[in-house]
Each structure stands twice: as structure tokens, then as C-alpha cells.
């Protein structure tokens, strides 16, 4: 309790020395005063649990996979709140990992969709899960077309494949990035002729297209592998064009232009591995983007504003606290959209 500095064990879900490992699979979700999370009690496997912070009660919400086996709610990283209902991945022991739901208003739990018939499971949302209105967009494998973009409309419980980007194989949407701009999803995918590149799906008219092929041919540019952030209408992300290494790129969604923002670590500096911007941190403060990047002097803090890119440190070696210097006299590069 931050008001009186007291600390206490809230509950002992699994008696003994092993522990219940709450939140192992899924990020805790707060609905009203109640926390929802996965935990294992030692008898029913890892299942969905809840803790009401208003009265300190804790209970198992549902035993999705009956017996000692685990339902593993939230495995793979998909959990999303729509109204009073939590949507998540779970395995009931017969249909594999599929999309499930729990309505917190009436305590009902059900399988929302069985995308891949049989016991294998479609493992939805392993790479991406984004809510647009009442509809969840996510990747899933139906067993025939591989991992593609799917959707589930929570208002009418309908589920469908949005696009088969890579016919007869997986396009693996969202493997390196997925972000919503207005009604349009921007995500990484591969179509079989080009590698993992930047794609888009307009949810208002159901059109899907490749936004940019940053690295020509079958190799991948892997957009957003380390960072992706929206500034106004522009997405900033890391990508590898095959010649300058992994550097800072941008896509203006208002005019469909894509460009390399800066070649921070030029090819003349120890090969073409690139600066790997945002590998450890990225944050937007006002109009300025702050991120880490690699130069010959090591990994340091950098910043970008429209029209310029500036190093905020000097000297050699990696910064480890402190080391911040005035930007005056720091390395500066300027790039403009093409």
C-alpha cells in the first residue's frame, strides 16, 4: 500500500513451497476492482483466476482443461478486453489452443472460435492482436493456409480469414510489427516473392496491400523488429534495406511515402550491421523521439525530430547512467522523405 508503505502476500493459491506463478502466461487484466490472471493451484493445472481488490477474495474463474492438465490461458501473449469480456487463448484439451472468452459481468466462459479443427489448435494472436471497434484482428493458423490475418467480431461472434497474403504457406503477419493508424492496420508480412515487409489492411473497406518493399527480393527488411512508434500520421520503425543495415525508417500514412530517416551507422563504420535503433528503448516526448542506437562509440541515447537526428552523448563506450551532454557539437544527420 503506497499510502502507508505496507506490503503483504495477497493470497496463497498453491500451498507449499512451489508457488502458483500468477501471470506466467498472460498480462494481468483489471476489470473494475478485479484482477484477472493465470495461475496454477497444484490440482487443476494452470487456469484463469481472479482477485477482487475491494474485498480481498481470490478464486478460480474457470477450469478450461478439466483435471490436472492446464488450459494455459493467455499462452502466446494474446489477451484483450472488449467491454466486460476478456478474449484470450486457451486449450481445453481437445481442440488445442484456440480463442476463448470470459464475460466478467456474468462469469460465463466459452470457446469463441475453433479456427483449426482437431487437437492441433490455431494458436491465435501469437504475433499480433489489435482491437478495431468491436473486432479483434490477429494472426492464426487454420491448418491449410498457414499463419494469416484473421478477425473475430465480438458483436456477433463471427470469425473469418481477412486475407491469405502468402498462398499455400504462412505470411506470418505481425511477426516483427503491428500498429493501428485510424482504420488501417500496418504490420509485417511476407507474400512468397518478397520477405517480411510492411503491409496494410484497411478495415473500413477490407483492402490489403504491400505498403513498401524496403529490401528488394526474397530477403526481409523485418520492419519494426525492435521498434515501432506512431508520431502524428507517421510510423517510425527500424528496418534493413540490405545495404545500410538496420537503421531508422519512416512511413507517412497520409501520403504513402516511405523513407530512411537516417543512416546513423554508415556502412563505412564496421560493416553494414546498422545502428539497430530502438533495440533497448524508445519513447516519444512531445515531438521528439528518443531511442538507443549503435555507433562506433557504442550504444548511446539518440533523438529524432522532423528533419534532424541528434546524438545526446559523446565519447567512446556504452553509456551506463549519466554521460548525458549538451547536444551542441554532437553528431547530426539530416534526412528528407523520398
Per-range role (PLM):
Residues 1-313, 319:
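Feature 14080 marks short, conserved micro-sites in well-ordered regions
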Residues 310-336:
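Ser/Thr/Gly/Pro-rich low-complexity, disordered linker/stalk segments of secreted
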